[in-house]
Structures are given as structure tokens and as C-alpha cells.
Regions:
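C-terminal motif of bacterial Sec signal peptides marking the signal peptidase cleavage site
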Residues: 15-16
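Sec-dependent N-terminal signal peptides
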Residues: 6-9
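Glycan-recognition and catalytic cores of secretory/periplasmic carbohydrate-active enzymes
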Residues: 20-395
């Protein structure tokens, strides 16, 4: 396992003579151009593998999934972001092709990940093309997701496994699936979708967060009282630790909820989570978190580039809802993360890394699963962050 240094090399931070920092717009443009070349290599490689989607690259071998894996929508979504920036017809063709591979998940009712699967793929496709056929897929998917909402609990159930331990498990990742419900409410006029999303966000805010605004990974609820009976981790270092990607999911989720509802309480929650993250004593100097902020092995423990990418994308958006020094702080931290991720420390040379863009993500460290490898969702949120930053720089 490679050890990621606490500070980025000078080559990652500076360009040219005399240590002059490369202009941010140039960093973004170069990163997007590199990403397009790498993503096209991946798209070409998998084009003949019917129904398969890239998941990771481990021990020198491709690891793929079918559409049922929770990450299936991320590679199609990455293609849509590349297309948004390049308008390359080859990328558009691939984006449509890989998006179609996920369509059957509109009927998924046995997990909460239908939001990840469909909104990252069909949602971006609809936004960029206006393809009306994508609306039916998204609405059907939202109806499927809604079957996992239990009014007595007020939340969307995340998982169905480990029923001997959890009555009604909800993980912080689930905040990311609410955007699909809110889209469905706006599209269909059915306010029940919105009520579910708001209820889920409110109860998560009440029961998932500690006084310092870090979050537990898993909260299981009593199905009769609707109150938590277990708070613990599944992928973090310990039940009381701050698993880095989980903190990023929460930051992103509440920022998104404010954008879509205008409810001030969600903006305040996002700000509080940001304060926790940006001021954490174990946040590395380059802004790319360790896989868990409380790992006992810091600094000799893997980073999670996916957490940095999710954070950066969320902070860029959150900065648009803030003013003055607060907005500047969010943007400065996101810029640091983007510069780090775009550096040779984290961006793979073209044609390597299994054709993924970013290196050094961590999936589930406690299970020795996907440790210090590329991950499809790291690339997706990195492309989203680059796209958001490019828009901001052009505005």
C-alpha cells in the first residue's frame, strides 16, 4: 500500500519558474482535458462488455459490476460531465449507451441506492439533452425509492440485511438520494415525494449528528417508536469516529437540500458540517482526508480521494450560498482540494490506473475492500467539482 504524503510535492502545487502558482482556470481546463482522454479510454474498453460498468481497478485487473451495484450510475454520469464540458459527439454516444445499461434499476425497491444509480446517469442526461424518455425512468425510479419510506419512522430505509441486529437501518449516504425525490415532486406535482425527502433530512439532522456536527454512519430506528436504538459504524474506524466519506455525504446532502427547498435549517446544517471538516486537526495539509479522521494509524493510513472530491463539489456549491469571508473560505478550501486532486499525486498518467482518473480512494477499510484504489464515484464527483468550478470562474 502506498503511503500518501501529508504535503503535496512542489510539482503538484506550482508550475513554471520561481514557484509561480498555476492559474486556477488553467488547472481546471487541463484537468478536464486529461479526464476526457482517460474517460474515452474507459468507455472504449467497456463498450463490448455487455451490461458491465467500471467499479475499480485492483491488483492490475479491471473490477466491474452490473447495474445492480450501487455505483452503477457513476460512470454514465462521469461521461455526461465530460460531454457537458467538451460537447464531443463521441462522448455523447457513449453517455447514452452506458446510461441505458442502468435503466432496469428504475424498478429497484430492495435498497436506497436507486437515487445514486439513476439521478447521476439519467438525471444528468435529462439536464443536458432534454430527452423526454429519461423523465419516465426517473419518475419510476422515484416511485421505487418511495416504497422504502415508512411513515411511522419518517425515513427511507437504507439496507435490508442484518435484520438480526438492525430494525430499520439508515446510513448517512442516504442523504444523497433525496434529490431524486425532490425532482419527482417538481416534475409530477406529487408533494408526497417532497414530504418524504424533507422528513428524511429533518430526522437525519436530529438523530444522525453529534454535538460537534460529525455524523454516525449507521443509525437504526425502532420501527414502533421511530427513535434510534443503535448508532454505530459499518465502514468507519469505530462507532464514535468520523468516517471521512460519510462526513462528505452529509455536507453535500444538506447543501443540496437547501438549494432544492430554500429551507434555512439545511443551510445552517451544511455550514456546521463545513466548520467541523475545515477545522479538523487531522485534516491533511493538502485537503485530501484520511479514510477516517479518527484512525489510530494516522498519518500512516490511506487517504480517500473520493471524500475530497465530494467535499470539493459541495463546498463550491455552498460558497454560492454564503457571503464575504465565509464564501471565500469555502472556495479556498475547495480550490486546495482541486489542485491536490489534479496533481500527479492523485491524478493517474493517461492510460494507467485501469483508465480511472483519480488514484488513492478507499472504499471499506475495515473489510480490506477497495483500499488505496481508484473508485468510479471519486471520478464522478471530481468531474462534477471541476464542472462547477469552471462555471464559477466563467461567471
Amino acid at each position: 500500500m502506498k503511503k500518501i504524503l501529508l504535503c503535496m510535492g512542489l510539482s503538484a502545487l506550482f508550475a513554471g519558474c520561481g514557484g509561480r502558482e498555476k492559474p486556477l482556470a488553467e488547472v481546471v481546463d487541463e484537468a478536464l482535458a486529461r479526464a476526457e482522454r482517460q474517460v474515452l479510454l474507459m468507455a472504449e474498453k467497456y463498450s463490448g462488455r455487455e451490461g458491465r460498468l467500471p467499479r475499480t481497478w485492483e491488483n492490475g485487473e479491471d473490477v466491474s459490476s452490473d447495474s445492480r451495484w450501487w455505483c452503477s450510475g457513476f460512470f454514465p454520469g462521469t461521461l455526461w460531465y465530460v460531454y457537458e464540458n467538451s460537447r464531443d459527439p463521441r462522448v455523447l454516444e457513449y453517455a447514452r449507451m452506458y446510461t441505458a445499461r442502468v435503466e432496469r434499476e428504475k424498478y429497484t425497491t430492495d435498497n436506497h441506492d436507486v437515487g445514486f444509480m439513476l439521478y447521476c446517469s439519467f438525471g444528468n442526461g435529462l439536464r443536458l439533452t432534454g430527452d423526454k424518455s429519461y423523465e419516465e425512468v426517473l419518475l419510476t425510479g422515484a416511485r421505487s425509492l418511495a416504497t422504502r419510506f415508512k411513515p411511522e419512522v419518517g425515513l427511507i430505509r437504507s439496507w435490508d440485511h442484518n435484520r438480526d441486529k438492525w430494525q430499520y437501518p439508515v446510513i448517512i449516504d442516504n442523504m444523497m438520494n433525496l434529490e431524486l425525490l425532490l425532482w419527482a415532486a417538481g416534475y409530477s406535482g406529487d408533494e408526497s415525494f417532497r414530504k418524504m425527502a424533507v422528513s428524511h433530512a429533518d430526522k437525519t439532522m436530529e438523530y444522525h449528528y453529534r454535538p460537534d456536527f460529525s455524523s454516525w454512519h449507521v443509525v437504526s430506528y425502532d420501527t414502533v417508536s421511530g427513535k434510534p436504538h443503535i448508532r454505530q459504524t459499518h465502514q468507519g474506524f469505530s462507532d464514535d469516529s468520523a468516517w471521512s466519506r460519510g462526513q462528505a455525504w452529509g455536507l453535500y446532502g444538506y447543501t443540496c437540500m437547501f438549494r432544492l427547498t430554500g429551507e434555512e435549517r439545511y443551510l445552517q446544517q451544511a455550514r456546521r458540517i463545513a466548520v467541523f471538516l475545515l477545522n479538523h486537526p487531522n485534516m491533511p495539509a493538502d485537503g485530501v482526508p484520511y479514510w477516517d479522521f479518527d484512525s489510530s494509524e494516522i498519518p500512516d493510513t490511506p487517504r480517500d480521494a473520493s471524500a475530497a472530491a465530494i467535499m470539493a463539489s459541495a463546498l463550491i456549491e455552498l460558497s454560492g450560498f454564503a457571503e464575504g469571508a465565509e464564501a471565500d473560505e469555502y472556495m479556498a478550501f475547495a480550490e486546495k482540494q482541486i489542485r491536490s486532486l489534479a496533481s500527479p499525486e492523485y491524478t493517474a498518467p493517461e492510460g494507467t490506473n485501469g483508465d480511472f482518473i483519480l488514484m488513492h480512494s478507499t472504499g471499506a477499510y475495515p473489510f480490506s475492500s477497495e483500499v488505496d484504489v481508484p473508485l468510479t464515484y471519486a471520478d464522478y464527483y471530481y468531474l462534477e467539482a471541476l464542472t462547477r468550478l469552471k462555471r464559477r470562474l466563467q461567471s
